[in-house]
Amino acid sequence: MKILYFSWIKDKLGKSHEEMQLNENIKTVNDLITLLKKNNENYEDVFKDTSSIKVSINMETSRFEDSIHDKDEIAFFPPMTGG
């Protein structure tokens, strides 16, 4: 699975992307976030309030409850704002 990070999320994590293999216990975006938060405190800080984060699965706007698979591309980014 490829995971992409944008904007302040990328800045806080210090990386724009990473690759990982999913185990069978990871079925949703929420499950993935729980796993990532166990990696280190930077993930815990980024994902403590997911109301300020949007997610896409394979470039489709998605929800945190949506199913994910090992070959998916997941992207985390802040909500779009206009000006």
PLM-predicted stretches and their roles:
Residues 1-81:
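Ubiquitin-like/PB1-type beta-grasp interaction modules and other compact soluble beta-rich domains
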